[in-house]
UniProtKB/Swiss-Prot annotation:
The gene is ybeY. It is found in: Cytoplasm. This is Endoribonuclease YbeY. InterPro entries: MetalPrtase_cat_dom_sf_prd (IPR023091), YbeY (IPR002036), YbeY_CS (IPR020549). Belongs to the endoribonuclease YbeY family. The keyword 4Fe-4S does not apply. Its cofactor is Zn(2+). Single strand-specific metallo-endoribonuclease involved in late-stage 70S ribosome quality control and in maturation of the 3' terminus of the 16S rRNA. It is an enzyme of class 3 (hydrolase). Binds 1 zinc ion. GO terms for molecular function: metalloendopeptidase activity; RNA endonuclease activity; zinc ion binding.
């Protein structure tokens, strides 16, 4: 049976309107992680563009805010902790992208949580074959949650 992901939700955004609920974040992360043998924990921090920009520059060398940053927790092998890591999601970027792509806002929030959670599990999209695998898994998870394929909007 799939274990529920415990979410530590931190809201560091001045505007807290139109944010998903803790229950929504939990549902989306749980469906992405699909843990069966442990009860994972993820911190989700909702930030404004200034914090996203600073973190994106510090950790990725990108001089702009981004939609989601993933910080996997690296635990020594001899220590068993259920912490998967942290997701930092920029509210303004998510809202802007949803509007630009013609996506429902809730669907884009869900996609960012699924996408970031998969990064915490070690998935990546740097190489083409990795991107195909990760995007396929994202689509499977999102449609399983009742959303449309998140990449179908990019083609319109």
């Amino acid at each position: 049976m799939m274990k529920t992901v415990t979410i530590d939700l931190q809201i560091a955004s001045e505007d807290q309107s139109n944010l998903p609920t803790l229950e929504q974040f939990t549902l989306w992360a749980t469906n992405a992680v699909r843990a069966e043998h442990f009860e994972p924990e993820i911190t989700i921090r909702i930030v404004d563009e200034a914090e996203s920009h600073e973190l994106n520059f510090t950790y990725r060398g990108k001089d702009r805010p981004t939609n989601v940053l993933s910080f996997p927790f690296e635990c020594p092998e001899e220590v068993e902790l259920p912490l998967l890591g942290d997701l930092v999601i920029c509210r303004q970027v998510v809202e802007r992208e949803a509007q630009e792509q013609g996506k429902p806002l809730t669907a884009h929030w869900a996609h960012m949580v699924v996408h970031g959670s998969l990064h915490l599990l070690g998935y990546d999209h740097i190489e083409d074959d990795e991107a195909v695998e990760m995007e396929s898994l994202e689509t499977e998870i999102m449609t399983g949650l009742g959303f449309e394929d998140p990449y179908s909007y990019d083609e319109e």
